[in-house]
Amino acid sequence: MDRKLENQKDLLNQDPKVELNSQSVAKNPLNSREVKPIQRRRPLRKNSRDKNSKPEFEERVIAIHRVVKVVKGGRRFSFSAFAVVGNKKGRVGFGHGKANEVQDAVKKAIKDAQNRLVSVPIYRKSTVPHEIAVKYLASKILIKPAPRGKGIVASNTVRAVVELAGYTDIYTKTYGSRTKINVVRATLKALLKLRTINQVAELRDLSPQQAQAQKV
């Protein structure tokens, strides 16, 4: 019993630290590799352009119609949307989309309008170069140039088209059918028939000054 107590005392008195020699260090597999410092990941920067940048093209929904189809199982509802897209710099388009949901129909209409963009002339960065009258089905529209600062004189449907096209001073008057779709198509038809002074001069084989003196 005395020997056991003495052995236990010897174990308690021993230093718990372990002495490392060169052999034990070499045998350690962790020391054979180079320990690389931990690299901290950089925080992701939020794109500041998304907040400040404006989309190049703006869109406006002209009309949304609900379509009902009668089948054997009952009625099926779908939606038809019409939208106008423009960059206010002479590019404008009109599109149509169909879907079972309103949001999907609007997205398709906007995408269709972006695929149908056309270029229209803007005189002095504000108005049309000359007066023009156009008929589309039962709708008629008259467009006249206006002095700077006058603003847009038009219905809400026509205003959506001319504003997105880039006109800021313009007179318009609609006659006949006031159906929104026909009015939009008549407006676009009129804008596409506009000609600048240089274009008229080339068609008539005149100088720009001579073409400006004549009626377009």
From Swiss-Prot:
Question: What this chain does, per the record?
Answer: With S4 and S12 plays an important role in translational accuracy.
Q: Which GO terms describe its molecular function?
A: rRNA binding; structural constituent of ribosome
Q: Which segment of the chain is annotated as a signal peptide?
A: none
Give the domain note. The N-terminal domain interacts with the head of the 30S subunit; the C-terminal domain interacts with the body and contacts protein S4. The interaction surface between S4 and S5 is involved in control of translational fidelity.
Q: Which PANTHER family match?
A: MITOCHONDRIAL RIBOSOMAL PROTEIN S5 (PTHR48277:SF1)
For this UniProt record, give its keywords in alphabetical order, as a comma-separated list: Ribonucleoprotein, Ribosomal protein, RNA-binding, rRNA-binding
Query: What residue spans carry the Polar residues bias annotation?
Result: 20-31
Region labeled Disordered — which residues? 1-55
Which protein, by its recorded name, is this?
A: Small ribosomal subunit protein uS5
Q: Which family does it belong to?
A: Belongs to the universal ribosomal protein uS5 family.
Listed under GO biological process in this entry are: translation
Question: GO CC terms on record?
Answer: small ribosomal subunit
Q: Which cysteines are joined by disulfide bonds?
A: none
Which intervals hold domain S5 DRBM? Answer: 57-120
- PROSITE patterns documented for this protein: RIBOSOMAL_S5 (PS00585), S5_DSRBD (PS50881)
The subunit structure is: Part of the 30S ribosomal subunit. Contacts proteins S4 and S8.
**Top-level taxon in the UniProt lineage:** Bacteria
**A family per Pfam:** Ribosomal_S5
